[in-house]
């Protein structure tokens, strides 16, 4: 799987960027160091000026790739969900058992992230922390409906649709497949956040993981 993934290009909706950052060394440095900087200081404090100083490049050169830091965040979140989707597809492709396929999918979507060295300019562990802490800022905006129409969230929605379809294969009569699928994806981020910051209001910890919780939740729901 790793060798196969290394030959694949993660595709992000092209309306999100002005110039594909994967097309140049500068673009890849923008992505690499934006992840490190946002993880370090948070998205609210992040600016293109600070990023430019970090990569020794003019602020204006960053604007050639992204028109705003919001678009950069959309790029990073889209890349992340596409990366998760690739793992889901390749790790479940040869699984004829639908329950095992869904169980593996829940594991992929909810597990703690390890760095994937197939993409040398992207630290997936730090990117995962950005998704946990900052993802909601990519869509909790006044422009969410227009951006949705432009296809900015197509990868995220496609991932949830894949999970929904797996749920329906197991129980075609389950009425809440889309709601459950989106709860797995969003809820996993929330449980990881609670595990790190509000330990008293989650049962998830080092021994009982979000993966354990969501497997229990999902299979009890669809088999009841």
What are these regions (language model features)?
Residues 1-11, 124-129, 134-140:
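Intrinsic, short, N-terminal disordered tails of RNA polymerase sigma-factor systems
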Residues 1-11, 157, 161-169, 182-224:
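C-terminal peripheral helix-coil segments that are non-catalytic and often amphipathic
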Residues 17, 22-47:
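Short, amphipathic alpha-helix enriched in basic
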Residues 32, 36, 72-93, 104, ...:
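Alpha-helical structural segments
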Residues 44-71:
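Helix-turn-helix
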Residues 91-125:
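Hydrophobic alpha-helical connector segments
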Residues 100, 130-169:
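Amphipathic alpha-helical packing segments from all-alpha helical-bundle domains
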Residues 173-181:
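Membrane-interface starts of transmembrane alpha-helices
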